């Protein structure tokens, strides 16, 4: 009996150690909670960031890389929308007059109800150049965007927009050609920045507006055109920027009722944060708008001239040639398919790159598992640099879609791809969950029905970012990158590994089903093998 009793005691020893260990762990958790409460409130886990250095703080995303991507066509929901990659930005955009349901309506945000037969980028390099074609019934618009960093430019450099308009039914009779109204606007999100009109007189100067921003410095916006155009302006003060179309349209309606003319009022609110310039004339006409940063008066004229007129034409042509050459280098289609197919390919990569947006805000997330009994709280303030699935219907970030987007984008510019992936992985919370739909900021929120706004921490999207990372690793093996690029990719993956592993663990523990199918096991083994490859890189 004593022998058997000793055996039982020895058998119970491991369990005793387990109980002792669990008791100690509970004690540590209780103590840590007390300590946390004494210092600061404990956040709900769903809105607690993953405890690791942000990928966006890596050196490869700083300095020249960060500045080179500062300005861009990062408002993909607009037919032409420009902003900077900063939470509070100077916004720029285009509206024009069109017909909708038999009445005059402003085109601004991409939407099928406008009835455009065509709109989209035909060339875009994702960095400093893009050309877009828009066909609105008889009106044909070509918009071009380009950046240029000159000596003396402020942070992010200077940029220019060219708008070319023509009447597709015009047969050369100028007196019968269509009279068209464009509305180019500037809107300042930062209350600490300035935005103003200084006595608009285009007969004496090309200056439209001026202002200052902390990192850009003093800036000016100039207009140049060889045609005779009428320019009018209005300045508003508003708290919201997602409804600028309504703001301008309501103002025009008042003007029509009071003065019987379709023309803004040439008045400016003393504290305006939105300036709208109505540019009107008979088609065809071309308008160049130049943003000059880091202004010093001695050099403004020279810099404006370099970004307008024949100089801008030359620069845009050079950028178009560079785009064509890079497209052939990346995809090599010239001798494989016909010329029409090449144009389709160029439009595909251009719309993918031109559909990249920058967003900042807070997601709405639920702390409760079942839908319908929501305790809704805000995620932490976050920025997101991402491609969007649709400029008209889904102009925001979708986790599932982004993996497929970046499968194409990395072949064009791996630095842009890593930047976007880093933004997404930095949205991970302490549990390894990433909200699958990112609705950040008022402009993004305005395009989403209320019932789809809240994100649930039990919901997942397929982890398609793993496909991109596997593809990039294959690209390294196939010598697709330079030694400098490989070094940056290695540094990125080395830092991203801990987040990717945690993300996989979250999937593997929260998304299990009742039945284990062969394809489910195959998916798990695929990701496990990829994580093993990344682990070996880290070793």
Put a short name on every predicted segment.
Residues 68, 93, 118, 156, ...:
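Intrinsically disordered regions, especially transient/low-confidence alpha-helical propensity segments
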Residues 255-274, 377-383, 485-489, 539:
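Intrinsically disordered, low-complexity acidic Ser/Thr-rich regulatory segments
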Residues 267, 330, 372, 376, ...:
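A generic structural signal for ordered alpha-helices
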Residues 151-155, 168-176, 365-377, 447-448, ...:
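Intrinsically disordered, low-complexity coil segments
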Residues 392-538:
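Aromatic-rich carbohydrate-recognition surfaces in CAZymes
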Residues 304-394, 423, 514:
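Low-complexity, Ser/Thr/Pro/Gly-enriched N-terminal "stalk/linker" regions
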Residues 15, 289, 371-372, 500, ...:
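Generic low-polarity alpha-helical segments
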């Amino acid at each position: 009996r004593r022998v058997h009793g000793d055996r039982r005691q020895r058998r119970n020893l491991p369990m005793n150690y387990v109980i002792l260990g669990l008791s100690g762990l509970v004690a540590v958790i209780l103590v840590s909670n007390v300590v946390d409460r004494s210092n600061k409130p404990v956040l709900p886990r769903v809105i607690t960031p993953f405890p690791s250095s942000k990928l966006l703080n890596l050196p490869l995303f700083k300095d020249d890389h960060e500045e080179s991507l500062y300005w861009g066509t990062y408002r993909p929901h607009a037919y032409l929308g420009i902003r900077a990659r900063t939470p509070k930005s100077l916004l720029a955009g285009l509206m024009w007059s069109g017909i909708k349901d038999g009445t005059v309506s402003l085109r601004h945000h991409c939407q099928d109800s406008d009835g455009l037969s065509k709109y989209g980028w035909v060339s875009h390099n994702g960095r400093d150049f893009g050309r877009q074609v828009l066909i609105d019934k008889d009106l044909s618009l070509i918009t071009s965007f380009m950046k240029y960093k000159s000596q003396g430019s402020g942070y992010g450099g200077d940029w220019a927009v060219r708008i070319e308009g023509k009447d597709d039914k015009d047969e050369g009779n100028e007196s019968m050609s269509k009279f068209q109204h464009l509305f180019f606007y500037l809107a300042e999100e930062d209350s600490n920045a300035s935005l103003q009109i200084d006595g608009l007189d285009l007969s004496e100067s090309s200056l439209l507006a001026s202002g200052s921003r902390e990192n850009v410095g003093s800036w000016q916006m100039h207009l140049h055109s060889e045609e005779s155009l009428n320019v009018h302006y209005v300045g508003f003060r508003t708290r919201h920027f997602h409804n600028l179309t309504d703001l301008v349209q309501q103002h025009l309606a008042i003007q029509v009722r009071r003065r019987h003319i379709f023309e803004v009022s040439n008045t400016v609110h003393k504290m305006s944060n939105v300036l709208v310039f109505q540019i009107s004339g008979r088609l065809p006409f071309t308008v160049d708008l130049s943003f000059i940063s880091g202004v010093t008066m001695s050099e403004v004229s020279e810099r404006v001239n370099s970004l307008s007129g024949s100089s801008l034409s030359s620069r845009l042509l050079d950028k178009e040639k560079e785009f064509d050459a890079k497209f052939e280098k990346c995809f090599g289609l010239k001798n494989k398919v016909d010329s029409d197919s090449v144009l389709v390919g160029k439009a595909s990569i251009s719309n993918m790159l031109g559909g990249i947006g920058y967003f900042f805000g807070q997601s709405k997330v639920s702390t409760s598992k079942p839908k319908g009994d929501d305790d809704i709280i805000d995620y932490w303030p976050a920025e997101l640099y991402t491609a969007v699935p649709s400029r008209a219907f889904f102009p925001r970030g979708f986790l599932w879609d982004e993996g497929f987007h970046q499968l194409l984008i990395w072949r064009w510019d791996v630095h842009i791809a890593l930047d976007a992936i880093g933004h997404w992985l930095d949205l991970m919370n302490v549990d390894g969950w990433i909200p699958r739909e990112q609705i950040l900021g008022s402009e993004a929120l305005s395009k989403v029905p209320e019932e789809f706004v809240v994100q649930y921490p039990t919901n997942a999207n397929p982890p398609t970012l793993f496909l991109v990372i596997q593809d990039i690793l294959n690209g390294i093996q196939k010598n697709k990158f330079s030694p400098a690029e490989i070094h940056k990719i290695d540094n990125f993956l080395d830092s991203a590994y801990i987040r990717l592993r945690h993300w996989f663990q979250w999937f593997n523990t929260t998304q299990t089903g009742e039945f284990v199918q062969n394809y489910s096991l195959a998916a798990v083994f695929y990701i496990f093998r990829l994580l093993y490859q990344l682990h070996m890189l880290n070793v």
